[in-house]
Amino acid sequence: MEVFYNSKFVTNNVFLNPSETQSKPEVKYSFENNKLYTLLMHDPDSVYGNRFHWIVTNIINDVKNGEDVLLYTGPAPPPKTGTHRYIFELYEQIKHNDVKIEERNISMNFVKKILNIREPISKFRFISRNESGGRRTKRSRTKGKRTNRNRSKRVGNRPTIQKRY
């Protein structure tokens, strides 16, 4: 499978900024004549669980000939959620599908079941993160450890907390 954003070839597992991926990509594959295919694009790292960005079914010979079950939406990872994987998966269909999907945050197993698809015949992925930071917030290394700042003083058998003003 080959993926092109803005007419540029994209290498598998490459990092792309969300701004580079807002337009619908062109997907190419060596399709067998008169067979039906389904293309899924999803983000398994979404804050709300698996999120679908694009679903195309009933593809014959070219993705452009397929039916958009779920229209394309470009990646938009929220700030401080780290790196997200965006995965394209191509499946061979058993029969013609007349399914409409409106929800984007749904499980992969549910989608596979309603589309009657099994295992992908081709996969592609890229990674992305929010352009305004993108790193998860670092946790304090001293969390739970006793340091000079949070050490308590013992009076008898009971600790009393040293207050900072």
Model-derived features: positions:
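Arg/Lys-rich, low-complexity, intrinsically disordered basic segments
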Residues: G134-Y165
